A protein has these predicted regions:
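Amphipathic alpha-helical "stalk" segments
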Residues: 2-155
Length: 155
């Protein structure tokens, strides 16, 4: 088993090197590279009256630093699935790309709020329209934001 695991890690490292993937090592409260401080007013204005916002506030208000780190790990795992699919030029409708879509939605639902397919599609629009979110994905691999968007929209 150890050999198989080592081979998978080597394969991932080679793929990452080919793509120029830049790893993310820090945990952030919302699971994205965006720091929460400085955005509270914008978040409140845009989503403050939604059920998702209330659910997220209720959940995260009880989280410890370890909880936020675990949420980050789950979201990074979903992002890595997108990186793999994109890096291997898989269609956005492929089984691997759609597994990344599901992992993305599950991570959000687990840690923040129930994320419906419709809600996830709204997030996908934000990933390509908001430069801050686009930078998060394209900071990993150039073009990843559009791929994530397209994969989510393809479900």
């Amino acid at each position: 088993m150890k050999t198989k695991y080592s081979c998978l890690n080597r394969e991932k490292r080679v793929t990452d090197q080919k793509l120029g993937v830049r790893p993310r090592l820090s945990a952030t409260p919302c699971g994205y590279i965006l720091p929460m401080s400085g955005y509270e007013e914008e978040v409140q204005e845009r989503w403050g009256d939604t059920e998702a916002y209330a659910q997220s506030q209720s959940r995260t208000s009880k989280y410890t630093h370890e909880d936020f780190a675990a949420a980050k790990v789950d979201q990074e795992a979903a992002t890595e699935l997108f990186v793999y699919a994109f890096g291997n030029s898989l269609p956005t409708t492929s089984e691997k790309a759609q597994a990344a879509v599901v992992a993305h939605r599950v991570a959000i639902s687990k840690w923040f709020y129930e994320c419906s397919i419709e809600m996830q599609k709204n997030l996908a629009l934000m990933y390509v329209q908001d430069p801050r979110f686009k930078k998060y994905y394209d900071g990993r691999v150039n073009g990843l934001a559009q791929y994530v968007h397209d994969a989510i929209m393809a479900q």
